[in-house]
Amino acid sequence: MRFLNIFLFFAVMIAFVSASPVLEEEEIDIEPRITCDLIGNERLCVVHCLAKGFRGGWCDSRKVCNCRR
């Protein structure tokens, strides 16, 4: 009887877990212009690129930070 209770418990838990909906990942909205619009103009872009492991960066005419390889 005890084996049956344990088996039913695990069967119900497996059914519960498999029936629950999978949560969708939230999309991350990245704003690339933030480093070129803030105080410091291109300096913040360079620091951002250096922190990501690049050799530097610059802001283009659309105020988007571009990192050098």
From Swiss-Prot:
Keywords: Disulfide bond, Ion channel impairing toxin, Neurotoxin, Potassium channel impairing toxin, Secreted, Signal, Toxin, Voltage-gated potassium channel impairing toxin
Subcellular location per the Swiss-Prot or TrEMBL entry: Secreted
Pro-peptide positions on chain: 20-33
One Pfam family this sequence matches: Defensin_2
The keyword Secreted is annotated on this UniProt entry: yes
A GO molecular-function descriptor: potassium channel regulator activity
Zinc is among the record's keywords: no
Residue runs in coiled coils: none
Coarse class of the protein's main subcellular location: secreted
Other comments on record: Is abundant in venom, since it accounts for 45.2% of precursor counts.
Domain note: Has the structural arrangement of an alpha-helix connected to antiparallel beta-sheets by disulfide bonds (CS-alpha/beta).
Annotated function: The recombinant peptide moderately increases Kv11.1/KCNH2/ERG1 currents and shifts the voltage-dependence of the channel activation to hyperpolarised potentials. In vivo, induces neurotoxic effects when injected into insects (tested on L.cuprina and A.domesticus).
Protein name listed in UniProt: U-Asilidin(12)-Dg3b
Species classification: Eukaryota, Metazoa, Ecdysozoa, Arthropoda, Hexapoda
